[in-house]
């Protein structure tokens, strides 16, 4: 199985024998207690691979792959329990989808849950019976994932919410509606949803919906323009004369002077690559793969793509390193990094990374909105 851009076996080849044995144990057992240990072992795994100089995006791909395995085992366990309780098998085929960073294969250490169900179509007359069954499954799945170490989503982006639990036809209608009746809330729902990936069940349901998303967004200039404008809150943290724009106390208590390397680092680049791929009708999720596809099509110049790849890798490296340090020191694991924790070379590279992202977004502003910066 591929873990992002790197074959899983190749990834494991750089780990010590102890870690390889630990990883092998990930395939053993599927109860909540065992999977909790699997989740906890991810920090040790990430730290060792980091020390072995594996690039951060490839560590993220491996962490995401492990999280998908956790999803599969949790769903298998929930289905077995429901069958044992006399609730029967699933009334229709379905796919469990994971969204956000998990859908892109770019999870850091402690992502929360972003999941949903795509159900095969069924008669409206059967809705109450079938939906009740999937509500039960969704409650079991999200409860167990939370117990294991994948926290409940504070924004309720979970299969327990009917907004994220629909038949394939309902999902297609929802996407078409979002593309026509635009607004801040709907645009942000699109941002969450458009990176979905099938984690369990009928992959073809997710593939069908992915094609519909690509067909709906491609050429829909007003929709893409409004998505770009809504993403403007997440800009690279670089100001005049190449100075970092750090956080205020009002942004996050106790983190004044820090950089939020997710909201002002990886996120602006992730959003830009997603938007360009939507415009081109490309059904690709991982950010680096999106960059490569856009370069292959001539949308990104070779040098520009090279700068952006370097930016993504460097920011991800700094963020993952900080999360590992915070966890090991018993501090809350966040997306915040203080500039003083960086070497001069790292800080210079980060400024160059932010500048590359800003240049891209300035160019996209002209393309998507027609606005030219003075």
Predicted regions, residues:
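A nucleotide- and high-energy phosphate-metabolite-utilizing enzyme signature
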Residues: 18-374
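Short beta->alpha transition motifs characteristic of CBS
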Residues: 2-18
């Amino acid at each position: 199985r591929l873990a992002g851009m790197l074959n899983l076996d190749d990834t494991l080849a750089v780990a010590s024998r102890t870690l390889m044995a630990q990883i092998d144990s990930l395939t053993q057992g599927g109860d909540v207690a065992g999977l909790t240990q699997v989740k906890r072992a991810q920090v040790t795994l990430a730290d060792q691979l980091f020390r072995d100089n594996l690039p951060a995006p490839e560590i993220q791909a491996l962490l995401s792959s492990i999280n998908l395995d956790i999803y599969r085992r949790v769903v298998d366990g929930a289905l077995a329990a429901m069958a044992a309780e006399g609730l029967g098998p699933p009334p229709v085929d379905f796919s469990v989808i994971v969204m956000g960073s998990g859908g892109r294969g770019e999870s850091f250490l402690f992502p929360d849950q972003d999941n949903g169900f795509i159900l095969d179509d069924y008669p409206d007359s059967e809705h109450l019976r079938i939906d009740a069954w999937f509500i039960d499954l969704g409650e079991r799945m999200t409860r167990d994932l939370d117990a294991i170490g994948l926290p409940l989503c504070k924004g309720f982006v979970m299969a327990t919410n009917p907004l994220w639990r629909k038949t394939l036809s309902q999902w297609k209608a929802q996407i078409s509606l979002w593309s026509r009746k635009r607004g801040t809330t709907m645009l942000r729902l699109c941002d969450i949803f458009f990176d979905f990936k099938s984690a369990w069940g009928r992959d073809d349901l997710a593939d069908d919906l992915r094609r519909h998303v690509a067909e709906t967004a491609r050429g829909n200039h007003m929709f893409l323009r409004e998505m770009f404008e809504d993403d403007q809150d997440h800009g690279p943290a670089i100001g005049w004369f190449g100075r970092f724009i750090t956080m205020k106390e009002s942004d996050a208590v106790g983190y004044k002077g820090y950089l939020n390397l997710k909201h002002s680092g990886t996120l602006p680049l992730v959003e830009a690559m997603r938007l360009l791929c939507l415009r081109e009708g490309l059904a690709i999720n991982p950010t680096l793969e999106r960059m490569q596809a856009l370069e292959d099509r001539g949308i990104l110049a070779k040098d520009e793509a090279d700068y952006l790849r370097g930016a993504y890798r460097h920011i991800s490296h700094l963020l993952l390193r900080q999360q590992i340090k915070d966890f090991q020191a018993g501090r809350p694991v966040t997306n915040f990094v203080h500039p003083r924790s960086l070497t001069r070379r790292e800080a210079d590279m980060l400024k160059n990374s932010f500048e590359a992202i800003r240049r891209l977004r300035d160019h996209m502003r002209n393309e998507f909105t027609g606005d030219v910066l003075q």
